[in-house]
């Protein structure tokens, strides 16, 4: 589910910092953060002139295969964010910066950042 790059998956599965059990407090904190960020009043606190670039893998189960990202993108637009962009990378999974097409992702992010520098 992480990436199609089997070298990255093998590295991840063998790394001591990536193969730990999530604690009850970890889950509690995760759900508190998810609850906080999904509240409409918190969307409305985001500065409307803050540019945002949402990128995700279209095959990421964590993002509901792109549907979750589309939903959040629309919520941001509906809250009045003026400059928001979204790109879903077909066939990419959760870690798009570690995918087989990572150079394309890097290039797209660099182009977006360059276009938004003042």
Residue ranges and their predicted role:
Residues 29-32, 71, 104, 108:
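Alpha-helical elements of Rossmann-like donor-binding domains used by nucleotide-donor carbohydrate transfer enzymes
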Residues 1-45, 49-55:
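Alpha/beta-hydrolase
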Residues 24, 65-69, 98-103:
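Conserved strand-to-helix beginnings and helix N-cap segments that scaffold or border functional pockets
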Residues 19, 61-62, 95-96:
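Short strand->helix junction
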Residues 51-54, 58-85:
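Conserved loop-alpha-helix segment in the C-terminal half of the alpha/beta-hydrolase fold
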Residues 37, 79-118:
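Catalytic active-site module of serine/aspartate enzymes centered on a nucleophile-bearing elbow/loop
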Residues 16, 56-58, 90-93:
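Short, histidine-centered active-site or binding-site loop motifs used for metal coordination
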């Amino acid at each position: 589910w992480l990436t199609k790059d089997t070298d990255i998956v093998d590295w991840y599965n063998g790394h001591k910092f990536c193969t730990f059990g999530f604690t009850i407090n970890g889950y509690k904190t995760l759900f508190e953060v998810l609850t906080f960020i999904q509240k409409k009043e918190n969307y409305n606190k985001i500065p409307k002139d803050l540019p945002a670039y949402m990128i995700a893998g279209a095959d990421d189960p964590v993002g509901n295969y792109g549907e979750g990202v589309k939903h959040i993108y629309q919520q941001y637009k509906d809250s009045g964010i003026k400059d928001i962009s979204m790109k879903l990378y077909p066939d990419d999974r959760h870690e798009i910066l570690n995918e087989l097409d990572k150079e394309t992702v890097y290039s797209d992010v660099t182009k977006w950042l360059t276009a938004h520098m003042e």
